[in-house]
């Protein structure tokens, strides 16, 4: 598989030969959907809590007598049928939202994403991205010259200047290959990979 090499002006020049195992896979929509859903589910913290009928503070007195009033029978005001009553199946912080995905499936899904990005022209290779100082303006000007606005940068090692400069840009992220997740790969319009990171990605996913 040949990946396009971009220069600092965003123009395509030479090509980089990459592994077909990683960057030449067929598109597998079902598998990609599965690993994205699992990634989102595993990110959930379980920070919602509701009360069941045992936890709500209500009297246990019967609201009215069983027969003779013409109204529906009622046992206590904490009933889930009543306003202010407890929930039948309340949300709990102890809920387990995790989804398990086998390692082979996860790797195959990432390969399918990388391959589709390459086919769509959303994946490009750069020699390296170097900044003289941790200034957001320097990085913003560089991306403006390349015609980019939503970028995921995958580098072999995260340079401190690059990381600090990217933090204040709303649609830019910098990660190492081992931290590239399926959701970010799909979300960003463009994925820039340094030449050294291509080899690391092939090693991780082959």
UniProtKB/Swiss-Prot annotation:
Q: Does the keyword Ribonucleoprotein apply?
A: yes
Annotated stretches, region: Disordered? 46-78
Q: Does the keyword RNA-binding apply?
A: yes
* Comp. bias (Basic residues): 58-70
Q: Which domain of life is it from?
A: Bacteria
Task: Give the GO cellular component terms, alphabetically.
Answer: ribonucleoprotein complex; ribosome
One matching Pfam family is Ribosomal_L4
GO MF assignments: rRNA binding; structural constituent of ribosome
Q: Which Gene3D superfamilies match?
A: 3.40.1370.10
Q: Which InterPro entries match?
A: Ribosomal_uL4, Ribosomal_uL4-like, Ribosomal_uL4_dom_sf
What UniProt keywords apply to this chain's record, in alphabetical order?
Answer: Ribonucleoprotein, Ribosomal protein, RNA-binding, rRNA-binding
Its subunit composition reads: Part of the 50S ribosomal subunit.
Q: Which PANTHER family match?
A: 50S RIBOSOMAL PROTEIN L4, LARGE RIBOSOMAL SUBUNIT PROTEIN UL4M
HAMAP family from the UniProt entry = Ribosomal_uL4_B
Q: What does this protein do?
A: One of the primary rRNA binding proteins, this protein initially binds near the 5'-end of the 23S rRNA. It is important during the early stages of 50S assembly. It makes multiple contacts with different domains of the 23S rRNA in the assembled 50S subunit and ribosome. Forms part of the polypeptide exit tunnel.
- Identify its protein family: Belongs to the universal ribosomal protein uL4 family.
This chain belongs to which protein, by name?
Answer: Large ribosomal subunit protein uL4
Q: Which gene encodes it?
A: rplD
